[in-house]
Amino acid sequence: MSAIENFDAHTPMMQQYLKLKAQHPEILLFYRMGDFYELFYDDAKRASQLLDISLTKRGASAGEPIPMAGIPYHAVENYLAKLVNQGESVAICEQIGDPATSKGPVERKVVRIVTPGTISDEALLQERQDNLLAAIWQDSKGFGYATLDISSGRFRLSEPADRETMAAELQRTNPAELLYAEDFAEMSLIEGRRGLRRRPLWEFEIDTARQQLNLQFGTRDLVGFGVENAPRGLCAAGCLLQYAKDTQRTTLPHIRSITMEREQDSIIMDAATRRNLEITQNLAGGAENTLASVLDCTVTPMGSRMLKRWLHMPVRDTRVLLERQQTIGALQDFTAELQPVLRQVGDLERILARLALRTARPRDLARMRHAFQQLPELRAQLENVDSAPVQALREKMGEFAELRDLLERAIIDTPPVLVRDGGVIASGYNEELDEWRALADGATDYLERLEVRERERTGLDTLKVGFNAVHGYYIQISRGQSHLAPINYMRRQTLKNAERYIIPELKEYEDKVLTSKGKALALEKQLYEELFDLLLPHLEALQQSASALAELDVLVNLAERAYTLNYTCPTFIDKPGIRITEGRHPVVEQVLNEPFIANPLNLSPQRRMLIITGPNMGGKSTYMRQTALIALMAYIGSYVPAQKVEIGPIDRIFTRVGAADDLASGRSTFMVEMTETANILHNATEYSLVLMDEIGRGTSTYDGLSLAWACAENLANKIKALTLFATHYFELTQLPEKMEGVANVHLDALEHGDTIAFMHSVQDGAASKSYGLAVAALAGVPKEVIKRARQKLRELESISPNAAATQVDGTQMSLLSVPEETSPAVEALENLDPDSLTPRQALEWIYRLKSLV
């Protein structure tokens, strides 16, 4: 800022501002002045554009007018929300000195920094989505990645081995803010992401990170957390924790542990798979018609967030999964009773985070009290559920009767938004506060009692007690009786017909009343802070309770979904394979107006790959995706949309389904497709579920068919992954004859004239034709084009009548070896018998042959 160059020429207030701004050069500074937050110079110009507020000028400093923009302090949350949503960070600078006693500018300091990844205010957060701060580190051995949800205290780290895994983690976690080192090499991995923050290298130093984390957790080492031997992850975690402390300007007592996320603990899905399966976000970027939109009928925001974490990290530990299945089964008869009570619990998890940060507002404490009030009824209902996991959750959620009683005594039923508004602490909680309030609310009772007492004591019937704004409280006696005023009455004011006096008792009372409002508010703030001190020792137990309540909400929700949507409990088997009876697509069946056609699936070590053929729009992609979604649902412990499911171990789910040009990166559809295919061929194992749709269609027929053939061969023979391979290359239907473990299935259709009916039913064997022209007609392609296409198709089929069933053996592709076309004139001459023609017919034939040439 150019203003700093001529620092001494500025006014004292602007000097104070410039010093504070120099400490936060990269972010906006909200500088408190009375009832406004002001922004100056470049900050003012940026804020006026980002917030669409007026840019004005404030006098002059150092001889130059100062660009200025301002926002009212009471509306600051709305403006912060707008800035945070645009990826901006804001330093909040408050007046901490007393204007009455300050010489020069009132003392100010930055009390907190609001950034996209460290917000905890209810107004700034989306209640049903996690809001993560993340840090990324890279060295020659791979990546380190750490995430922190400051609104819950959830702290995670991982060490992705390669670029693809790191990209998948970024897509899964979708951080609101991402810290990276100034020498980070893979900038193309993170470019274009929101909330990028470049940090100096020393913030990622490993020894500093260990020291920071041990200090935070009160430990001597990190062995107990299982992260001791994760140096890259620790580098990221250390930078992240320091950043969180710097922005919050307070301790973070709710961050009490860190967890290592290992690849072997969950089913791995790359970025393309998460996108294609539309788990929580559809291909258009919205939330409609996603798996989460069908499964998420949770009644608390923290339950909704937990369910989405489960969906993005399916677990492989069958003990955990069987426990969840058992719990869902046990809860199915209790959902109607439990959900209305759970709904009243609210977002306890985030309230506790604000409590830990000492930013909880009065209504947060009222909601916490309301949550505590639900616990006895919840525990009573759960007592009847015959399930060990449910009883474990019941114990973990606790009851907190003492804290409930404390908040019932301390906080009024409907408190105001802010403690500075007053009227938060309930009457009867603190005797001194009640006295100050009684004074502040009016002195009528006291003054009436004083008047009666003084009349009786002095015998003066004209004596009365009053108040005016200039002289304060007084005792008034008529001029006729003023000579009888007691000696301790000090004259305060003389009127035409009366004298006004003050006595020490009334003066003392006046001082009390005039300061009582300020005193009441100050004491109320003190008592409110003391409530934090009384609640915070229970923070760990409260966080465990919130976690148990969120998990209960998820499991009750999955029980309700299973019952309502007619899902079945899947069975886990030891060998690789998936057997599905009457499987359905969980999302498509909800949006269809007609009944969904259920289909079977059988994959096993002896039947590892299905070659799927059939018409466009016939249901190939739906069939493939439903298989992956059923597997995904099974591995979060949910029931699944099918009549019966047996499923073996799965380590990864891959999808190569559909593609679009990646214009921003300069990659064509075919390049995107091949990149995803390469990732699958490098990383799939015999325990992987692979969906391959239309491989090779973005290049020439020779190249495409060759690639598709080789990929299918590699997956079936070498990798031996469980594979669904949809294709329009009918040559691939010969694969089952050439290798073991491959089978043909197809989705059929019926064609009648110019119309087509898709059966959506999976049958064994290869499809007889692709019905491409019928689908084109259905799509509205002009009739003359369809007519010409049919004509051309007949010509091609007459040239190579067995095209669909040609033999392929690596070097020969007879479909592509099209014989030379025979002229219609030659065909006509071959069929002509000249001896049988009359002269007139011979002449007609000459003209006809001429027209055929």
From Swiss-Prot:
PROSITE patterns for the chain: DNA_MISMATCH_REPAIR_2
The keyword 4Fe-4S appears for this protein: no
Binding site for ATP: G614, P615, N616, M617, G618, G619, K620, S621
GO BP: mismatch repair
Keyword entries, A-Z: ATP-binding, DNA damage, DNA repair, DNA-binding, Nucleotide-binding
Pfam families: MutS_I (PF01624), MutS_II (PF05188), MutS_III (PF05192), MutS_IV (PF05190), MutS_V (PF00488)
Domain of life of the native organism: Bacteria
GO cellular component: cytosol
InterPro entries xrefs: DNA_mismatch_repair_MutS, DNA_mismatch_repair_MutS-lik_N, DNA_mismatch_repair_MutS/MSH, DNA_mismatch_repair_MutS_C, DNA_mismatch_repair_MutS_clamp, DNA_mismatch_repair_MutS_core, DNA_mismatch_repair_MutS_N, DNA_mismatch_repair_MutS_sf
SUPFAM superfamilies per the UniProt record, alphabetical: DNA repair protein MutS, domain I, DNA repair protein MutS, domain II, DNA repair protein MutS, domain III, P-loop containing nucleoside triphosphate hydrolases
Keyword Nucleotide-binding: yes
Molecular function via GO: ATP binding; ATP-dependent DNA damage sensor activity; damaged DNA binding; mismatched DNA binding
NCBIfam families given in the database record: mutS1 (TIGR01070), PRK05399.1 (NF003810)
Protein task: This protein is involved in the repair of mismatches in DNA. It is possible that it carries out the mismatch recognition step. This protein has a weak ATPase activity.
Family: Belongs to the DNA mismatch repair MutS family.
Protein's UniProt name: DNA mismatch repair protein MutS
Source organism (scientific name): Escherichia fergusonii (strain ATCC 35469 / DSM 13698 / CCUG 18766 / IAM 14443 / JCM 21226 / LMG 7866 / NBRC 102419 / NCTC 12128 / CDC 0568-73)
